[in-house]
Regions:
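Short amphipathic alpha-helix that is part of the acyltransferase structural core
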Residues: 1-31
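Short alpha-helical
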Residues: 10, 55, 65, 111-112
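Active-site rim helix/loop that mediates acceptor-substrate recognition in acyltransferases
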Residues: 22-51
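Conserved beta-strand in the GNAT
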Residues: 48, 54-62, 67-74
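Active-site beta-strand termini and strand-to-loop segments that position acidic
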Residues: 50-52, 140-143
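Conserved acetyl-CoA-binding loop-helix of GNAT-fold acetyltransferases
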Residues: 75, 81-94, 119
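Conserved GNAT acetyl-CoA-binding A-motif
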Residues: 96-109
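Conserved active-site alpha-helix within GNAT-family acetyltransferase domains
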Residues: 110-134
């Protein structure tokens, strides 16, 4: 189980540090979205999952006029396959629905993330037909 809290300057620094290392070592990850992550932190839309007082994952989301989107969700490579991503996602979904969002969207990039989001109830978005090589757009409607 992780504690999920709005980011602090310290947790932001920790996230950016491991994303930069991941980019350098593997050429993968979300360090390319550094400015989005910092802007989301400044707007209070970056939430970090902590275990043993260390950031093990984070989620960036934003509320729009009617719906909301989860823009980035990543779990530190050393902490994957422990359910932390599901905890971050369900916490973000609950928070967004509690603010009145009628739906939450995600863009599956990489496409290998699609089964994860579908396991949480997300379905293809009709307004974004899936095309080969492009990210899949999924939506989860608030039925409450």
């Amino acid at each position: 189980m992780i504690n999920i809290l709005v980011s602090t300057k310290q947790s932001l620094t920790e996230v950016l540090g491991w994303l930069e290392r991941e980019q350098t070592e593997s050429g993968e990850g979300f360090f390319c979205n550094e400015s989005t992550i910092v802007t989301s932190h400044d707007a209070g839309e970056l939430f970090c999952g902590l275990a043993d007082n260390r950031v093990v994952g984070f989620v960036v989301h934003n509320k729009k006029s009617v719906g909301a989107s989860i823009d980035i969700l990543e779990v530190h490579p050393q902490h994957r396959s422990r359910g932390f991503g599901s905890q971050l996602a369900t916490n973000a979904i609950g928070r967004l629905f509690a603010t009145g969002a009628a739906f939450v969207t995600v863009q599956c990039s990489p496409r290998s993330s699609e089964p994860f989001w579908r396991s949480l109830g997300f379905l293809p978005q009709d307004s974004y037909p899936s095309r080969a090589g492009e990210p899949t757009h999924l939506v989860l409607h608030n039925v409450a």
